[in-house]
Every structure is written in structure tokens, then in C-alpha cells.
């Protein structure tokens, strides 16, 4: 198997030390976060430019830029993610190694209640509580000892059967069936409410500073979205998320135009309700998006993320996944934590099956970021099976990577 390691891949992405002075830091009127801006570029947009074209030079700058990107992603494709509602309560029970967390959230006279089973490790509870993995629709990856698992019924929060699922689910029972939020945004809302109540439920013995999220396929898209928009998530693990996940819209279109049979934006909006209805207005003109999913993943930085893709399934957009995460990696690099971002792309297994020979890569991220152990997380690899389509970084990335000052 031929692996291409990150040290080779990012030669086209030089790191530039930029001046300490930042005009954005001097602005007293705050951070402008419009939901849409004039834009047109076939290349992957520079995540290190503010909406007005000035450069991001510091971590303080990035905090504003992150807000801008989050607003744009909601404005174009995700719909509005509402803040914590005034009512968020819970009950928790446990019998042996099995617990149940019930969350009630909403407004006076209009709440919804959902429950999640929790499986706890055997052994003595750590002083700060167990690390927790939130698994969309159930667990599809192996986990090391010492991590609790909460099974999240995200489809109850935002239904995802087909286009008839628009506005259906417990989130929409609270916010209205015409709410702009996509199903994936609704899922993020549910994850946030789970974390809200765990923070004030000591009986659950969960370390809320060590919460991870994962999911596969459509749920992998959701896990990535949760990691991007919920900053209390300590580790994000999308598995085979494909189009609308850790791939980029522009690159998937390129694959399709090159003769590969992949899922691109024009098709995905007809399949389900993972994106807002507003996204329909842009899927035939992707170049007007002032971001792509390298920037969606970049919202997670500097928090850790590792994603997995499967080249046996062409429709997952293998070149797009690799290229998109190659373009995302400089965001962690600019913050001085490149080993907080990993990517693994192999084949020879079924969709959502996790090959055991990949366990060391996954466990390294669990060990380092949830269990507090020493581990090497410099992991970025592909088998380069792109079905004849050629990845050329200079075709898509015409920006350089700054070193963001503190």
C-alpha cells in the first residue's frame, strides 16, 4: 500500500511568519459576521482572509474569523443553529454499567424530551469522571478501555429519511417546522443540550472536558458538524462522511466532471434534508460559496480531529476527501498544533466497517486527547486510489499558511 505522508503533501503550502501587529485586534466595534457576502472563486477559499480581504495574523484574529466562517456556513448551507434555550433540565439513572440520561429542553409551554443510554467502563471512576464518546446512531468504531459511550438518537431530533423529513423531529417541535436549520444543525443542538446537562449532573461521573463525538456516513457528516459548532467537544472522529462531510464541494464537482461517479452538491440536496433549503440556490454555482468544507473542519482547530475515508466507494469522493483535508490541515498548522489533525484513507473494507489494522491510529487520538497518555498523532495518509483523477494542490490552493501570533 502506497502512503503519501503529510510532510510531502504540504510542500506547496509554505508557512510564513507574519507581523505581530493586527488591524483587526485594534478594531473596537467587534467582529462582523454576515450570513452571506459577494464571492466567486473556483479555487478553495483562503481561510486566513477576513470577509473584507484583510489577513488573519493572530489567534485573536482567528477567533473572529472562526465566527465569520460559522455564520457563512449557517447562512449558505446549514441553516440557523439557535442558542441554548431557557429551559434545559435532565434526569439521570444508572444500574450497574448502564445509565440513562433524559434531557428536556425548550421554552415555557413548549419543550421536548429525549433520552440517551450510556454504557460505562468497568473499574474505578477517575477523579474527574469518565471520558465520554457521543456516538451518532450507535458505535461503529472500536474504543480503548476507560471511555464511556452515549448512544445518540440524532434521527429523532432531526429526521433524515428523505426530503419528506424536512422540518420533522423533536428540534422542530420546539423551533417550528419552518425553522431554517438543517437536520444536521438540529443534531448539533441536541448534542449541545446533552453536554449542558452533563455539566451539572455529577452523578453521571462524566468528565465534560473530555467529550468526543463520532458517526459514520450520514452520521459522520453530523459528527463533523457537531465538532465544528460545539466548542466543548474535545475530539471529533468522522468516519466515511463523504460528500457534505470531510470532502469539499468544489473538489467533488471536479471529480464528477472528470468522469468519476461521486455525490456532489446538486445530488445531495435531492436525497435528504442534511442541508438547509437555502443551499439549493447555490449547488449549481459552487464557486460563489465564500468557504468550503476545509474551513468547516477548520472550525474545530485547535481542538483535535481525525477522519477516516474509504476508497473502495467511489461515491464517497476519495480525491475530494483527501484534498479537502489537505487544505484544512494548515489551519491546525498555523496554530502550532499540526498533530491535532489526522486523516486516514484506505480501502479493502465495507462501508462503515473499521479495519482492525487502523486501530493504532484511532487509539493514538483517544489516548492523547481523552485518556491523557503519550501518543504520536502525526497521522495523515492515503492509498492514493483516486480512480484516475489527479490531485494537484496548486490547482486548488493559491494561499500560504501564516504562523498565527498569540
Curated annotation (Swiss-Prot):
Provide a Gene Ontology MF annotation, just one.
carboxylic ester hydrolase activity
The residues listed in the UniProt record as binding substrate, with positions renumbered to this chain, are 221, 263, 271, 315
Q: How does activity depend on pH?
A: Optimum pH is 6.
Q: Does the keyword Flavoprotein apply?
A: no
- Enzyme class of the recorded protein, top EC level: hydrolase
In this protein, the active site sits at 217, 351
Compartments reported by the entry = Secreted
Highest taxon of the source? Eukaryota
Sugar-modified residues: 100, 110, 122, 178, 285, 348, 376, 387, 398
Q: How does activity depend on temperature?
A: Optimum temperature is 40 degrees Celsius.
Q: Keywords for this entry?
A: Disulfide bond, Glycoprotein, Hydrolase, Lignin degradation, Secreted, Serine esterase, Signal
Disulfide bonding pattern of the chain? 31-64, 216-352, 248-324
The UniProt annotation puts motif GXSYXG catalytic site motif at: 215-220
Q: Name one GO cellular component term.
A: extracellular region
Q: Write out the GO biological process terms.
A: lignin catabolic process
Family to which this protein belongs: Belongs to the carbohydrate esterase 15 (CE15) family.
Task: Give a short account of what the protein does.
Answer: Glucuronoyl esterase which may play a significant role in biomass degradation, as it is considered to disconnect hemicellulose from lignin through the hydrolysis of the ester bond between 4-O-methyl-D-glucuronic acid residues of glucuronoxylans and aromatic alcohols of lignin.
UniProt-recorded name of the protein:
4-O-methyl-glucuronoyl methylesterase
Amino acid at each position: 500500500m502506497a502512503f503519501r505522508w503529510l510532510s510531502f503533501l504540504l510542500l506547496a503550502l509554505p508557512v510564513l511568519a507574519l507581523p505581530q501587529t493586527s488591524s483587526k485586534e485594534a478594531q473596537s466595534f467587534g467582529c462582523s459576521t454576515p450570513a452571506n457576502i459577494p464571492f466567486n472563486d473556483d479555487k478553495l477559499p483562503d481561510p486566513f482572509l477576513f470577509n473584507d480581504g484583510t489577513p488573519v495574523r493572530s489567534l485573536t484574529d482567528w477567533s473572529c474569523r472562526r465566527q465569520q466562517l460559522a455564520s457563512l456556513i449557517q447562512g449558505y448551507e446549514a441553516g440557523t443553529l439557535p442558542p441554548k434555550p431557557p429551559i434545559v433540565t435532565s434526569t439521570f439513572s444508572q444500574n450497574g454499567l448502564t445509565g440513562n440520561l433524559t434531557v428536556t429542553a425548550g421554552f415555557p409551554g413548549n419543550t421536548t424530551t429525549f433520552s440517551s443510554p450510556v454504557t460505562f467502563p468497568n473499574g474505578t471512576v477517575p477523579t474527574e469522571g469518565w471520558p465520554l464518546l457521543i456516538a451518532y446512531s450507535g458505535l461503529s468504531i472500536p474504543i480503548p478501555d476507560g471511555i464511556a459511550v452515549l448512544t445518540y438518537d440524532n434521527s429523532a431530533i432531526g429526521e433524515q429519511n428523505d426530503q419528506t423529513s424536512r422540518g420533522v423531529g423533536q428540534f422542530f417541535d420546539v423551533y417550528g417546522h419552518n425553522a431554517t436549520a438543517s437536520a444536521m444543525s438540529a443534531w448539533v443542538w441536541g448534542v449541545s443540550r446533552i453536554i449542558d446537562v452533563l455539566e451539572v449532573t455529577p452523578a453521571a461521573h462524566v468528565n465534560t472536558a473530555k467529550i468526543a463525538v463520532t458517526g459514520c456516513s450520514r452520521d459522520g457528516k453530523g459528527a463533523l458538524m457537531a465538532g465544528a459548532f460545539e466548542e466543548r467537544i474535545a475530539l471529533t472522529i468522522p468516519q466515511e462522511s463523504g460528500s457534505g462531510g470531510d470532502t469539499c464541494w468544489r473538489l467533488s464537482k471536479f471529480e464528477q466532471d472528470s468522469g468519476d461517479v461521486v455525490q456532489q452538491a446538486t445530488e445531495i440536496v435531492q436525497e435528504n434534508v442534511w442541508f438547509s433549503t437555502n443551499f439549493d440556490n447555490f449547488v449549481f454555482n459552487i464557486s460563489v460559496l465564500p468557504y468550503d468544507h476545509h474551513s468547516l473542519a477548520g472550525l474545530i482547530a485547535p481542538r483535535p480531529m481525525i477522519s477516516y475515508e474509504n476508497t473502495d466507494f467511489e461515491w464517497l469522493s476519495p480525491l475530494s476527501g483527501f484534498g479537502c483535508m489537505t487544505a484544512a490541515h494548515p489551519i491546525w498548522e498555523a496554530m502550532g498544533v499540526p498533530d491535532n489533525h489526522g486523516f486516514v484513507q484506505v480501502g479493502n473494507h465495507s462501508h462503515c466497517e473499521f479495519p482492525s489494522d487502523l486501530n493504532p491510529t484511532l487509539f493514538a487520538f483517544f489516548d492523547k486527547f481523552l485518556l491523557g497518555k503519550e501518543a504520536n498523532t502525526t497521522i495523515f495518509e492515503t492509498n492514493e486510489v483516486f480512480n484516475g483523477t489527479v490531485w494537484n494542490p496548486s490547482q486548488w490552493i493559491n494561499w500560504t499558511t501564516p504562523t498565527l501570533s498569540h
